[in-house]
Amino acid sequence: IRDGACTMAALQDLGFHEEAHAFLGFIADRMAAAPLQVMYGIGGDTELPESTLDHLSGYEGARPVRIGNGAVRQRQHDMWGWLLHLMERDLVGRDVPVDDRSWADIQQLAAEATDHWRLPDQGIWEIRGAPRQFGSSKLMAWVALDRAARLAERRGEPETSEAWRTEAAAIHDDLTTCGVDDRGVFTQTYGAPALDASMLLVPLMGFLPGSDARVQATVLAIADGLTDQGLVLRYRPDEADDGVSASEEGTFTICSFWLVSALARIGKIDRARALFERLVAFASPLGLYAEEIEPATGRHLGNMPQAFSHLALIGAALDLERATG
């Protein structure tokens, strides 16, 4: 859900609206059949059992090779925000009213966000450890209710819009109270100091403006403290039990492009442009990116090509263009 919605939003940014509309139709069909889950097979499959293929190895002997995805049954409370964000952009971008089918889906997604945002989950990075109170999940729950309120207003449902705005305000207060540490930095989880690159989404999703001191502190803390040779890690494995491994991993390409966007939002244009140009130089001869980059060598690691990396490239380029006029 998350990856697909983010990809469709990037296509919308480039003027391709029909793809996003078709994707939302696919999701609406799934929602009509059964409760929404965090992922589906490309044909709408709901069962994606995970197993390892011990007779195979990946790039340079990497193991284990997995098929399926064990995260299919996880609790990931950010997904409603990504979908409602996309739905609002779709309806506004096509300049159409909120029809009855869309309204039913909006109500269902907003209800799920309302019912679950206070609960721990596995978060945007699909950790396999114990569920936690992830800041980015709270952020995207706020996005869900904020966008739902806008859509209710568009449909002419003022009472529902106000109720969702009230719930969004409660999430906003909770995250700014419990999700910010003594440095004024948004952290990975409530009550812990670990940084997480997903908190770069605070300004990118409109939760707070780039001029806010907490946003500036968070962006600079990540730029200075969650990087390897200037490229951004998701988090530090030794600070976050992800249930997989405590070993080192490469820098995440999407996170580095998020940092470009966030630096542009807080007015650090030269720093944003320098990072963007460095990242562009890492592209393959075909202009493609993998999931991760090894900073010392520029070697691409993980899934290749990775949609997440390219959609963040698009967002970073557009943010730089807007910031520089």
Give residue ranges: language-model regions.
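Aromatic-lined, polymer-binding surfaces characteristic
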Residues: 77, 99-162, 197
